[in-house]
């Protein structure tokens, strides 16, 4: 018989840097999950990723306080900031442009994010990423 699910916890955890401090500790502690067990397992699984890369993680907590987790690809904004070399997006989206990004760069990001996006093909995924770039205050150029 399958284990009964107690709940889900969604966190954005830096790759290879899970520690019992907030926000991880309190979120897992409320559900009675072994915090150090999660941190060790997460850090072991994300060894190959670049240290500090934010990874959206969904933790499934079962009634017997055991857990499983799934990591997803880093957020589109992380890839966009890396491609353009930004620290943060525009504070005045639509009025202030902070940089430029090419369609080729958008397509490359879309290919990396494809499995986590709700899109049927790379073109649709690129349009989703383009929307994120525009909302960060970036100008999309053809070259």
Swiss-Prot record:
Keywords: Methylation, Ribonucleoprotein, Ribosomal protein, RNA-binding, rRNA-binding. HAMAP family: Ribosomal_uL11. GO terms for cellular component: cytosolic large ribosomal subunit. The keyword Ribosomal protein applies. One of its GO terms (molecular function) is structural constituent of ribosome. InterPro entries: Ribosomal_uL11, Ribosomal_uL11_bac-typ, Ribosomal_uL11_C, Ribosomal_uL11_C_sf, Ribosomal_uL11_CS, Ribosomal_uL11_N, Ribosomal_uL11_N_sf. Part of the ribosomal stalk of the 50S ribosomal subunit. Interacts with L10 and the large rRNA to form the base of the stalk. L10 forms an elongated spine to which L12 dimers bind in a sequential fashion forming a multimeric L10(L12)X complex. It comes from Phenylobacterium zucineum (strain HLK1). GO terms for biological process: translation. Pfam families: Ribosomal_L11, Ribosomal_L11_N. Forms part of the ribosomal stalk which helps the ribosome interact with GTP-bound translation factors. This is Large ribosomal subunit protein uL11. One or more lysine residues are methylated.
């Amino acid at each position: 018989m399958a284990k009964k699910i107690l709940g889900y916890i969604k966190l954005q955890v830096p790759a290879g840097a899970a520690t019992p401090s907030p926000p991880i500790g309190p979120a897992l502690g409320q559900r009675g999950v072994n915090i150090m067990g999660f941190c060790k397992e997460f850090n072991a699984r994300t060894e190959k990723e670049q240290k500090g890369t934010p990874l959206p993680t969904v933790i499934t907590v079962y009634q017997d306080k055991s857990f499983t987790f799934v990591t997803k690809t880093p957020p589109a904004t992380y890839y966009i900031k890396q491609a353009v070399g930004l620290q943060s997006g525009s504070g005045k989206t639509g009025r202030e442009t902070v940089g430029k990004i090419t369609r080729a760069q958008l397509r490359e990001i879309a290919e990396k994010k494809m499995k986590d996006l709700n899109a049927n093909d790379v073109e649709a995924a690129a349009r989703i990423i383009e929307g994120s770039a525009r909302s960060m205050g970036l100008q999309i150029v053809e070259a």
